Amino acid sequence: MAHHIPLPLPLPLRRRLHHLFILALLAVASGNPSPGVYDRGAEEAEAYSILTFHDYTPPPPPALPPPPAAPAATCAGDLGGVGDLDTRCVVPVSVRLEGGGVFISGNGSLQLLDGVSVTCQRPGCVVSANLSGDIRFGHGARVVAGWVSLAATNITLGDDAVIDTTALAGNPPDKTSGVPTGIYGDGGGHGGRGASCYVNKGQTQEDSWGGDTYAWSELKTPNSYGSKGGSTSVEKDYGGGGGGVVWLFADEIVMNGTVIANGGNGGTKGGGGSGGSIYLKAATMQGGGKISACGGNGLSGGGGGRVSIDVFSRGEEFRMSRQCRSSWDTL
Ligand SMILES: *[C@@H]1O[C@H](CO)[C@@H](O)[C@H](O)[C@H]1NC(C)=O
Ligand SMILES: *[C@@H]1O[C@H](CO)[C@@H](O)[C@H](O)[C@H]1NC(C)=O
Ligand SMILES: *[C@@H]1O[C@H](CO)[C@@H](O)[C@H](O)[C@H]1NC(C)=O
Ligand SMILES: *[C@@H]1O[C@H](CO)[C@@H](O)[C@H](O)[C@H]1NC(C)=O
């Protein structure tokens, strides 16, 4: 993966912000993977103008669709942990999940010790937790899966902790998949269109696109996977996978780590997958983490995904950086 350049956002305002809503629309792809854009304050108007342009009707108040079902998990059995999910479950060593993933619920807390990873490296594999207590990721702790949905009183990602759904998307929505047609190695689409290096007769490069934009109706509660990049071969699939989905819901989120839903890279024979979806909802959020739902690189870049951050109040300490590749980052 290419170089990541974190960009600090302006310092938080020195007062309580009322229901600060940051909607990040990840823009159209060019030859490069498309970058994410965080909109704040005045820039928010611009974001909404895009919606108007697309004849968009506002969604009902955020209703949280249930994550895909997965079998109920136990602390010792599924997570190799110590304790139980109705009091406190501590996972001391890394675990590789089998099957479709895990659904974790209980009245207790969950803690991944420093450096521990919970991995389910299959497209669309679910790691879902809904706990009354806390969820804590120690330093360098990781969760890797296609759909990661965590709800708890507090969620804490320690330094260098990572939630990574890169290229692990399950199936995109039915009607408009965003997956490019043909064998031109085009990029997948989602928040933006994928790029294409193939120019149709009578069209210019600027008019040539890969996969389509989709999922306009869930801008505030994005829940779509990114789509796959195209291939240059009918026999072999060289396209990068789409980015997955990450949802985090808590009263307080401490984000010192990284949340990633990037599309996969397609290499020289396939298009990049498009970015997936990230939705964070909290009363307060602090820390200095990174959030990324970029399209993957490839013969043609994948479109960006969607990021929605719905935070009532940002702690004085909260700062966030964006990490997409491409020259756009230097803007
Ligand atoms: C969890 O807490 C709720 C509400 O306090 C209670 O009704 C439920 O029985 C508890 N569940 C367990 C497994 O302790
Ligand atoms: C978590 O579980 C509670 C109680 O079962 C439920 O009310 C709530 O909607 C769940 N939250 C999410 C995000 O699924
Ligand atoms: C969540 O965090 C708050 C503020 O740091 C703390 O007061 C509270 O006890 C935490 N909740 C739990 C369940 O640990
Ligand atoms: C998060 O980062 C802040 C600032 O560096 C630090 O004060 C805090 O202890 C960190 N928290 C965790 C859980 O790593």
Residue ranges and their predicted role:
Residues I163, I291, G301-L331:
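Leucine-rich solenoid repeat scaffolds
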